[in-house]
Regions:
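Adenylate-forming
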Residues: 262-264, 278, 298-328, 358-381, ...
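Conserved ATP-binding/catalytic segment of the ANL
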Residues: 16, 236-239, 246-312
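Conserved AMP-binding A3 loop
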Residues: 11-37
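Conserved C-terminal "lid"/linker of ANL adenylate-forming enzymes
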Residues: 335-337, 388-448
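Conserved A3 ("GATE") glycine/threonine-rich loop of ANL adenylate-forming enzymes
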Residues: 61, 105, 167, 173-181, ...
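Conserved pre-ATP/AMP-binding loop-to-beta segment of ANL
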Residues: 1-15, 22, 46-52
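Conserved AMP-binding/adenylation subdomain of ANL enzymes
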Residues: 34-52, 59-155, 166, 188
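Active-site loops of AMP-binding adenylate-forming
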Residues: 30, 177, 186-192, 199-217, ...
Length: 448
């Protein structure tokens, strides 16, 4: 006899990413997956005739587990990518999806691909595209409108076809998305984009923005199945009583905590870490620091990390992930791992350079540099100084404190990815692994 599961029964054991230590098996119930799936249906992820989803995240990842639950329970079609994320744009051209879920790095590739196409246009066409984009951006900022009766069919159709021509909804998560990139893609592709936030422990659906919200830089509010609170973090000077220094408006800040039916049942065979993660009142402590934007409907903005912080010699706290998210916008930086030794007073970093921009700079030194040999120059001090200079300029623009500026850098010939276990499938750096892998290099940077 088949016995149907109860809401509290375990549906899946989903392992955490391992960015802060060993992966832990989060026990996710049927009820948690069901209620979070229902939340997804209220984000714009609603199905119409002819919809299709492009799947590329690994099914061991909680986000894809959640989306598959939504798709399969509704009998909805989806296509699976070819297996190489570098070919994702080509896969989209073939499948012609209407829905996508991705991390910011993937959307950054789309953004760069569109700009590469625009760059190849003649003067007149390039001006037409620029005018169309600017007018649509203006309309979106004023009225929240993504489509245009003239520009879309006559000018922007080839751009829209870069991802198949039918995309209408994109969900982004895992890391903050550049507001400029987000709004550009919204109007260039005539597609809604929402930002989500969550962890394996809360079934990936803790907080999500609305598709009609044209203000970037936040992650929206709680899914209706969740309670959210902010916990004071005295060590980092974050308090729920904080106020905006300029306006005096209440601007609470603190560690984001969540509870509700979407919460996991605990870590498999790991009562110690379960008790560390969930307090006696049932609140899961995320390790992320949030700020409530009281002037914008109490939307939440991620501003820092409680976990993964460390102290330098003078006692200053450093949140490396916050710095990395900004430094990856540097024109030479594809990936970056920021590291600090508590016995030193400055930061160092391992950088995976961007191929195109790095080659362009190296050609000013040696005209024979090409795609096949550019990595041979990664020990060149002139290149390192150029990258450090660009990173410092970017940091200053983003209000880096003096001790947050990277002083020395190593250029890595290999990327951080799941294959070498230096990153998760969503490209979050596994800090313990990266520290171990680059230990000698990091030590040498400090000993130079």
């Amino acid at each position: 006899m088949i016995i149907p599961p109860k809401p509290d029964d375990i549906c899946t054991i989903c392992y955490t990413s391992g960015t802060t230590g060993y992966p832990k098996g989060a026990m996710v119930s049927h009820g948690a997956l069901l209620v979070t799936s229902d939340v997804m249906g209220h984000t714009g992820f609603l199905w119409q005739e002819g919809e299709v989803y492009l799947s590329y995240l690994p099914y061991a990842h909680i986000m894809e587990t959640l989306i598959m639950a939504v798709l399969i329970s509704g009998g909805k079609p989806f296509g699976i990518y070819s297996g190489n994320t570098a070919e994702l744009i080509e896969d989209a051209k073939i499948l012609k999806p209407t829905l996508m879920c991705a991390v910011p790095r993937i959307f950054q590739r789309v953004y760069e691909a569109i700009h590469a196409n625009i760059k190849q246009l003649n003067y007149i066409k390039k001006n037409l595209v620029t005018t169309a984009i600017n007018q649509k951006l203006s309309n979106f900022n004023q009225y929240g409108v993504l489509t245009h009766v003239i520009w879309d069919p006559l000018v922007l159709k080839p751009i829209r076809e870069i991802l198949g021509g039918r995309l209408r909804f994109m969900l982004v998560g895992s890391a903050p998305m550049d507001p400029e990139v987000m709004n550009f893609l919204r109007v260039a592709l005539s597609s809604e984009i929402v930002e989500g936030y969550g962890q394996t422990e809360n079934c990936a659906g803790m907080v999500i923005s609305h598709s009609w919200d044209n203000i970037c830089g936040h992650i929206g509010g709680p899914g209706y199945c969740n309670e959210i609170k902010l916990k004071d973090v005295p060590d980092l000077d974050y308090y729920s009583t904080d106020k905006d220094p300029e306006t005096g408006a209440w601007r609470p800040r603190g560690e984001i905590c969540v509870r509700g039916p979407a919460l996991f049942k605990g870590y498999l065979n790991d009562e110690v870490n379960t008790k560390l993660a969930v307090d006696e009142d049932g609140w899961f402590h995320s390790g992320d620091v949030g700020m409530i934007l009281t002037e914008h409907g109490n939307a939440i903005k991620i501003i820092d990390r409680v976990k993964n912080i460390f102290k330098l010699q003078q006692g200053e706290y450093v949140a490396p992930e916050k710095l990395e998210n900004i430094l990856e916008k540097c024109k030479y930086v594809e990936q970056v791992f920021v590291y600090g030794d508590s016995l030193k007073n400055y930061l160092v970093a391992v950088v995976v350079p961007r191929e195109k921009e790095t080659i362009e700079f190296l050609k000013t030194i040696d005209k024979d540099v090409n795609k096949d040999n550019y990595k041979d120059y990664f020990d060149d001090e002139v290149l390192k100084k150029e990258i450090l200079k660009e990173m410092e300029t970017l940091g200053r623009k983003n209000d880096f404190k003096g001790f947050e500026v990277i002083k020395k850098v190593h250029l890595s010939k290999i990327p951080f990815n799941a294959e070498n276990d230096l990153a998760t499938p969503t490209l979050k750096i596994k800090r313990p692994n990266a520290k171990k892998y680059y230990k000698k290099i990091l030590d040498d940077l400090y000993n130079q």
